[in-house]
Amino acid sequence: MTISTLLLSPNRRLLTCLSRVPSPWLLHSSHPAPGPPGALPNCFGHHCTKRVLLSDGFRRTLCVQATLKDHTEGLSDKEQRFVDRLYTGLVKGQRACLAEAITLVESTHTRKRELAQVLLQRVLALQREQELRNQGKPLTFRVGLSGPPGAGKSTFIECFGKMLTEQGHRLSVLAVDPSSCTSGGSLLGDKTRMIELSRDMNAYIRPSPTSGTLGGVTRTTNEAIVLCEGGGYDIILIETVGVGQSEFAVADMVDMFVLLLPPAGGDELQGIKRGIIEMADLVVITKSDGDLIVPARRIQAEYVSALKLLRRRSEVWRPKVIRISARSGEGITEMWDTMREFQHQMLASGELAAKRQTQHKVWMWNLIQENVLEHFKTHPSIREQIPLMERKVLSGALSPGRAADLLLKAFKSRH
């Protein structure tokens, strides 16, 4: 009797007996999932083949395997070896492979982006298997950090990150660095402001230029998060430039959104958009030391009162306001305890898992919008008309809305 026949058998006692058979026998007797040469024991193919006999979810597992096969069929031998090398090195925790993989997903070259999607599909499949073994709960914690310039984000991350690595965590910091709209250049200076943390072998800091994207969050931030998690980093910090739309973009990528604010004078609440405060799961008043302790306490009280008037986004969590000092270390431990409390409550209620699923849909639609716009602009029939339409809009001959309608009609007529 073949394995496929046994899978269709209604005799669950027989399947239970088979589940006790050592994994190597299963791999030899059944059709193993495609996997990289020399893959690790915990690689995707090994677990999926065993899961076929262990649960009723084998149809979904086989579907994922078929998807992986579809992705790899068009690869040359050289490309397959390249993806295999990156994947194997990534799951082994090799920092060089992680850096190379992030560089691959950041590439604008069409073929390299296709290879990046193959790699991401394999990492996501492994991540899904690990979550299934953890009762469907995420194994990592994603935190978005934002705040106005001068709030002390980099100083805080270094102090906070060192505390986490000393506790045995592996930390990845994705620091989105603003690019020049004129030259496209970027300083990428976050590592120079986190000297001690950048030397820590349990921390990985990756500055990423925005390349002029709106809001300061790169197109590939989601992909970089997944790759860092595949590389064994259990805490991911995403630091944004804090210039408006970046906060809304990063909120669709993280489990917890933390807003860092300095103790300043004047109308503080008027300077922060209401929507940004509503998104915050935790408001942190930084630089609460020395002469700034009194202003920090006043700002804390103002935000506590303000948050009471806002609609809660979670049924189990009410946003809190705390004070910290990265210079003295005061409040850093309490802040981490608050963040862990948030994570535990969201996991227990199931809100965190639901949030991750929603974020995957947002991720997909964001990519669709970006790719459709790129395809529209580069379409031969549209590319020739764009300069003409722009001149007519500037001269007042056409309204922007009318020009857009004409371009869209021309685009539809060619399809």
Swiss-Prot record:
GTP binds at residues 147-155, 289, 325-327. It is an enzyme of class 3 (hydrolase). Its main location: mitochondrion. It catalyses: GTP + H2O = GDP + phosphate + H(+). It is found in: Mitochondrion; Cytoplasm. One of its GO terms (cellular component) is mitochondrion. The keyword NADP does not apply. Pfam families: MeaB. Belongs to the SIMIBI class G3E GTPase family. ArgK/MeaB subfamily. GTPase, binds and hydrolyzes GTP. Involved in intracellular vitamin B12 metabolism, mediates the transport of cobalamin (Cbl) into mitochondria for the final steps of adenosylcobalamin (AdoCbl) synthesis. Functions as a G-protein chaperone that assists AdoCbl cofactor delivery from MMAB to the methylmalonyl-CoA mutase (MMUT). Plays a dual role as both a protectase and a reactivase for MMUT. Protects MMUT from progressive inactivation by oxidation by decreasing the rate of the formation of the oxidized inactive cofactor hydroxocobalamin (OH2Cbl). Homodimer. Interacts with MMUT (the apoenzyme form); the interaction is GTP dependent. This is Methylmalonic aciduria type A homolog, mitochondrial. The lineage of its organism: Eukaryota, Metazoa, Chordata, Craniata, Vertebrata. The gene is Mmaa.
